[in-house]
A protein has these predicted regions:
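Acyl-group handling in specialized metabolite and lipid biosynthesis
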Residues: 1-8, 113-117
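Mid-to-C-terminal alpha-helical segments outside catalytic/metal-binding sites
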Residues: 53, 154-195
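Catalytic metal-binding/acid-base residues of hydrolase active sites
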Residues: 2, 30-32, 66, 105, ...
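Short secondary-structure capping/turn micro-motifs that flank functional sites
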Residues: 70-71, 115-116, 180
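Short Asp/Glu-rich motifs
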Residues: 73-75, 118, 183
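Divalent metal-binding pocket/active-site signature
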Residues: 6-102, 122-123, 127, 145-154, ...
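Glycine-rich, positively charged active-site loop/lid region within alpha/beta enzyme cores that binds
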Residues: 102-169
Length: 195
């Protein structure tokens, strides 16, 4: 397991830069307009700076986006940095398609098991094999049948089994596939960063 580095909500990137050789990605970064939409401009500016940092460090990003689909795509397009994961994906298939077209991987959490999450199931079925990941998003969003508990990594098999049924494959095959995808993206490569 290798850590990712994030900075929230400030521009102090020194801890990330100082630890870059230990990191597998920059994040969780991104936009969340759910609770404070009035901070949208500041969030977009910080997100753009974080994407530039990831570019300089030659690291993928782990992106959080909530109630900010258009703004997320806008910042990504302005930065022209399309290398990483959209974590805990809960968007629509059209939004997913735009992210996939830009080169991102889609990570599915325990939300896929929730009764009201048909849009997440549709997105999970749509994602190509080589662009799919699974995650816990611990300590939140425990999958059914553990919903209501604090989430933990040991619950990931519930998500994998459910997702495998949705994709008409076996849990074992899906686990191997998503593990390989994560390793391919997050295994540190020889440094060629500018910092």
């Amino acid at each position: 397991m290798t850590p990712t580095g994030g900075s929230c909500p400030r521009y102090d990137f020194a801890p990330i830069i100082d630890n870059r050789k230990k990191l597998s990605a920059v994040g969780e970064i991104g936009l969340d307009f759910h609770y404070a939409p009035e901070t949208a401009k500041a969030q977009c500016d910080l997100f753009a700076a974080q994407l530039e940092l990831a570019r300089e460090l030659n690291l993928p990003v782990v992106i959080h986006t909530r109630d900010a689909d258009d703004a997320t795509l806008g910042v990504l397009d302005e930065s022209d940095f399309h290398y990483g994961i959209i974590h805990c994906f809960t968007g629509s298939v059209p939004f997913e398609r735009q992210l996939l077209d830009r080169g991102f991987m889609i990570s599915i959490s325990g939300i896929v098991t929730f009764r009201a999450a048909e849009n997440v199931r549709e997105a999970a079925r749509y994602a190509p094999d080589d662009r799919l990941l699974v995650e816990t998003d611990s300590p939140f969003l425990a999958p059914v049948p553990m919903r209501g508990n604090e989430n933990e990594p040991s619950f990931l098999p519930y998500t994998v089994h459910f997702l495998a049924e949705q994709r008409k494959t076996t849990a074992e095959s899906l686990a191997l596939l998503t593990t390989a995808n994560a390793e391919n993206l997050l295994t540190p490569s020889p440094p060629n960063s500018q910092l």
